[in-house]
């Protein structure tokens, strides 16, 4: 029984390494889409990330070796960078919308009639 588990681990590591490399490529594509403000590519990247997360979860963390652990850490770091970029972009958009439309809950005097 231990032999079958030993044989399964390299195949799992190979599949995991492949999935992690694909995830890194998707995260790099996501970063480019964020920089270009390309909503269509962001949606595609999100869909691809979700599928890869499912594939990686099916393999499980027990298949991690030094190589796959390093790939997983790289993917995590790229995802964190993308999260920060997304948050900055969202804050920028929110600030611009607020500047254009005013804060919610404040009296808008832009279109009020002039006082005589």
Where do the PLM segments sit?
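Extended, charge-rich alpha-helical scaffolding segments
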Residues: 1-73, 77
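Short terminal interaction segments
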Residues: 2-6, 68-116
């Amino acid at each position: 029984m231990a032999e079958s588990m030993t044989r399964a681990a390299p195949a799992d590591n190979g599949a995991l390494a492949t999935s992690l490399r694909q995830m890194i490529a998707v995260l790099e594509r996501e970063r480019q889409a964020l920089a270009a403000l390309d909503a269509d590519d962001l949606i595609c990247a999100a869909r691809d990330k979700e599928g890869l997360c499912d594939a990686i979860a099916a393999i499980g963390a027990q298949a991690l070796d030094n190589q796959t652990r390093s790939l997983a850490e790289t993917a995590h770091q790229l995802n964190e960078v993308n999260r920060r970029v997304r948050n900055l972009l969202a804050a920028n958009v929110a600030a611009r919308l607020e500047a254009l439309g005013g804060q919610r809950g404040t009296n808008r005097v832009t279109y009020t009639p002039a006082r005589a």
